[in-house]
Amino acid sequence: MSFLNTYNLLLRATQRVIVLTLFATALVMAGCINDEKHTPEDTTLVNVGDTAPDFTVKLLNGKSTTLSSLHGQVVMLIFFSTECPDCQNQFAEIQRIVAEKEPSFKVLAISRGESIETTEEFSQKYGITFDVGTDPDRSIYDRYATLYVPRNFLIGPTGRVEALTIEYDYDQLHAIWEKAEQMSK
């Protein structure tokens, strides 16, 4: 057997091992991603019909606000992470909606587990014009859910959760936004 034939056989064998390794890795990763123990629904602590837990949050403008101080108003409470691609897409869409028409309800976004500086950079990047706060230790977020962002909670004037969405979906975002507009008329 010539050197070239031996080389080609080794090359093909190596390629097969690499392909099989990648395939096996993909199967393992798919199993982790689809782990039924961590579905968005199972990680939700506050559901439609529940009273939204009160909290105090520090806003990027330096002031603080409480959810209870917004009692009587319709509130869209958004939990997000600045590094989450779905959150970035959602904020780009929300800011586009807000630029077309100022919402008739209160929008309050809270970054989960991030610093004021990181959240300010994100807010500036997306040109966010509504209130944004930070929850660096996740103490607020952990009262509402255990995993997954973005999460949008539509809270009615009585403090009850009227609707919620988990992760970014264009149609769901527009549906909950429209419901907030209808409720605040």
Where are these regions (language model features)?
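Loop/turn elements at helix/coil->beta-strand transitions in domains of secreted/extracellular proteins
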Residues: 72-75, 103-106, 130
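Thiol/disulfide oxidoreductase modules built on the thioredoxin-like
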Residues: 124-128, 136-181
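Structural microenvironment flanking redox-active thiols in thiol-disulfide oxidoreductases
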Residues: 88-126, 136-143
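N-terminal targeting signals for export/organelle localization
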Residues: 1-52, 172-181, 185
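Short loop/turn microsegments at loop-to-beta-strand junctions
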Residues: 52-53, 75, 149-151
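Short active-site neighborhood of thiol/selenol oxidoreductases, capturing the structured segment around
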Residues: 65-88
